[in-house]
Amino acid sequence: MSKIIGIDLGTTNSAVAVLEGKDPKIITNPEGNRTTPSVVSFKNGETQVGEVAKRQAITNPNTVSSIKRHMGDANYKVKIEDKEYTPQEISAMILQYIKDYAESYLGEEVSQAVITVPAYFNDSQRQATKDAGKIAGLKVERIVNEPTAAALAYGLDKLDKDERILVFDLGGGTFDVSILELGDGVFEVLSTNGDTHLGGDDFDNKIIDWLVENFKADNGIDLSQDKMAMQRLKDAAEKAKKDLSGTTEAQISLPFIAAGEAGPLHLETSLSRAKFNELTEDLVERTKIPVRNALADAGLTNADIDEVILVGGSTRIPAVKEAVKAETGHTPNESVNPDEAVALGAAIQGGVITGDVKDVVLLDVTPLSLGIETMGGVFTKLIDRNTTIPTSKSQVFSTAADNQPAVDIHVLQGERPMAADNKTLGRFQLTDIPVAPRGVPQIEVKFDIDKNGIVNVSAKDLGTNKEQKITIKSSSGLSDEEIDRMVKEAKENEAADKKRKEEVDLRNEVDQLLFQTDKTLKEVKDKVSADEVKSVEDARDALKKAQEQSDINEMKAKKDELTKLIQDMSVKLYQQAQQAQQASGAQGDTSANNSTNDDNTVDGDFKEVDPDENK
């Protein structure tokens, strides 16, 4: 079975890992970094992902970041020039980039992946993530909750221990708390809670708002109306936030941020850690509630927890660490790299699927309750939140009116008592119910949740055995036909991108060869014949012409011709140098022989010394 890669598809950064032997290993990207910015940019028909895309975010308005915040929103589209992209398509571009460099590292095709999602992602968001994987050419073998994956990374070498751990996962855009029980290789999730719209981006935005407010007060100019200025502020805010994890004050310097009546204006200020804590106090407070809820749902207290694990780059913020310690009564365990733990855990789960990791069982839970709408708009739960998955539950309902020929099944997910306040996952209808008074027909509604947290619902008339089923797919906003079209487009773009990269590489090789040729000709002009020099010059000029005409095939052919001529010339020069060296060596030997007959040569007398003589 081929390798299954583990992908942490993050809001701000993503990472990929693979199991090598018994240990998971992070795969570095082409820039040599262990994480890749979850950023996509479009320019001149070319798509760029990662660090390259992030670097041009200031100057290129067609740059997309933090798309994960919109996963599962069927109405959200990103408009780039004349085309609209869904969150799944943008995410697929990130996944495809990760897939490509994972393949380069492994030296083989990658077609399977375990992808992580926030524990509090609903069905729509999970399905959208799975669709993104499919568009990128990946079969998503398993969707794993991020805190659960981090627990796998933490606990792989502790399979003989019995522990209860609390995973506090604060990433770039989402926040989760999960409580797990580890014992005999079983990783059982007891409860999960969180906020899918809380993360490092929100901390950045607090700094940005503060900078905008102060600059407006000092200069009367609202920087929030200037797109380019806002991007510079975002970069500066992110840097200041990171700096404040290690220092008590961060300097923010943005020259020429705006133009005033008297000329250019500069933003020069400092942000203390105390002020940053004040600005973000409400965000830190928001992290405490899910901790309490997760403990309550698991029926545990702080005293029952053995370890607290921090995951996600935003847990490096000192105020967050202090809040975790104050709320749980435990000093957080920082043995796991917060940026890499999730991807490492996903790779371990990939190893469990392939059979490379044995004696490990992962029991996850559904984060939100599932049910249907019943009479009066009430939400009737069939599966409660924090139920271990996979699971199945059925309940019998009846008709609400006499002679009712059909029932509408409105599938929902959430915790509110009224249907209208919860998330609609899908609707379907069971028809041809025999005529009967209200309350007589027996309609069995059955919910199935698979290991990925994907929901299947069926309704069956127990009197006639007529059944109708629905797999909740449409909630992600994409039909099978749309996904197939996007898969096809992604493959076409992949081929075009590959061709474009090959062209760029070829042009770079040609430039390097032309430079090397001119340099070589200067060095060897007096050492080779005029005919040889001319043949190289002609080949060089032919390559330059092909380069100017952008004729790729001709460039390849002429490059190969010139390369051969340069190599032949280099071999000849090397042989000449070798012959000259040999001749010089022979002359040296002759001189040495002559010197032995010199009348001034003195023969030395040597006396053998007995080692015992001086004892």
Swiss-Prot record:
Cited Gene3D superfamilies: 1.20.1270.10, 3.30.420.40, Actin, Chain A, domain 4 (3.90.640.10), Substrate Binding Domain Of DNAk, Chain A, domain 1 (2.60.34.10)
Protein name from the UniProt record: Chaperone protein DnaK
Keywords of the record: ATP-binding, Chaperone, Nucleotide-binding, Phosphoprotein, Stress response
HAMAP family: DnaK
Family statement: Belongs to the heat shock protein 70 family.
Biased amino acid composition, Low complexity: 575-599
Transmembrane segments: none
Annotated region (Disordered), positions in chain: 575-615
Name of the encoding gene: dnaK
The organism of origin for this protein: Ligilactobacillus salivarius (strain UCC118) (Lactobacillus salivarius)
One GO MF term: ATP-dependent protein folding chaperone
The organism's place on the tree of life at top rank: Bacteria
Pfam families: HSP70
Sites of Phosphothreonine modification: 174
Its biological purpose: Acts as a chaperone.
Induction remark: By stress conditions e.g. heat shock.
